[in-house]
Amino acid sequence: MSKSRRIGILTSGGDCSGLNAVIRAVVHCASGKGWEVFGIRQATLGLMARPPQVSKLEIDQVDPLLTSGGTMLGTTNKGDPFAFPMPDGSFCDRSSEIIAGYHQLDLDALIGIGGDGSLAILRRLAQQGAINLVGIPKTIDNDIGITEHAIGFDTAVNIATEALDRLHFTAASHSRVMILEVMGRDAGHIALAAGIAGGADVILIPEILYSMDDICYHIKHRQEEGKNYCLIIVSEAVRTQDGEILTLTNRLGQSRYGGIGEYLADQISDRIGAETRVTVLGHIQRGGIASPLDRLVASAFGVAAVNLIEAAKYDYMVAWQNRQVITVPIEEAIAQYKAVNPEDALVKTARGLGIYLGE
């Protein structure tokens, strides 16, 4: 049995399916080595709290969580600790509080599960405060460099595909154009994969320009062939024909992507008079039972992260390539944003299927 260690684990950024499967894998693997695992609540906020908000994790506690969505530890995607928003509207550097919380717990290492933004913040904290960090990539957007698969992506694709499957019947029954708006931020991975798997007729992603004239021609051409409906899937950050990225703003003044589906519907209705409906999938893509692939990758990532700690190989992230886990420096991974390559094999597949994908 290896030397006993105390390790912390936290989830940071937006939630997704597969996070609990990672936590379960870490606890199983670490417990087998005689180590203790401490779950940190609400990302770095748990280390900022006094006393730190943590709980020791046991196998019987995490075992039922393999399939469950969300994160048992809670998470947040707000509050950069280096410019933390205060009640009076000012911003304060509270990074030292997080670092102190880590050392107060006498942890030997920290496993951080997050997207590129979260991993960048955690790495900065680790460098500043002598934190032994290992990273695990998660994001439904699948835009983290080097890894072919980030936790949560496959489940999000499955959900978007099922939505297209269901919309197919309504579109055909009412002779409508049905538009499905999906997440993904500035990367079109969800729309591309789900569009192919769900039989979309038009796939629009931020990386490839499109023409409203061509979309309308595609719809009319289908009608001439006796196909009285059309399925369109669009990624949330696709621009209008004028180059504008549409956003929605809440009562607090916070903006997020949204509105491209309605924009397309109005354009299509005005140009060719087609009856058009929009479905915005939203946060449904983040929840629910994790897909088998997400559970598989999450389990492999959790074990690999523990093994990195045992080897004292810190400031590394686990990644998925060619159906196996590799390890890469966190700095290298977060520096390589992964958008859809217009020459990607899936783009060629979509074009080969006759799907309109832009110019």
UniProtKB/Swiss-Prot annotation:
Chain positions of site Important for substrate specificity: 117
Source organism per UniProt: Nostoc sp. (strain PCC 7120 / SAG 25.82 / UTEX 2576)
Pathways involved: Carbohydrate degradation; glycolysis; D-glyceraldehyde 3-phosphate and glycerone phosphate from D-glucose: step 3/4
Enzyme class, broadest EC rank: transferase
EC number(s) recorded for this UniProt protein: 2.7.1.11
Cofactor(s) the protein needs: Mg(2+)
Residues that bind Mg(2+): 116
Stored Pfam families: PFK
NCBIfam families for the chain: PRK03202.1, PRK14071.1
SUPFAM superfamilies membership: Phosphofructokinase
Official protein name in the record: ATP-dependent 6-phosphofructokinase 1
Alphabetically ordered keywords of this record: ATP-binding, Cytoplasm, Glycolysis, Kinase, Magnesium, Metal-binding, Nucleotide-binding, Plasmid, Transferase
Gene3D superfamilies noted in UniProt: 3.40.50.450, Phosphofructokinase domain
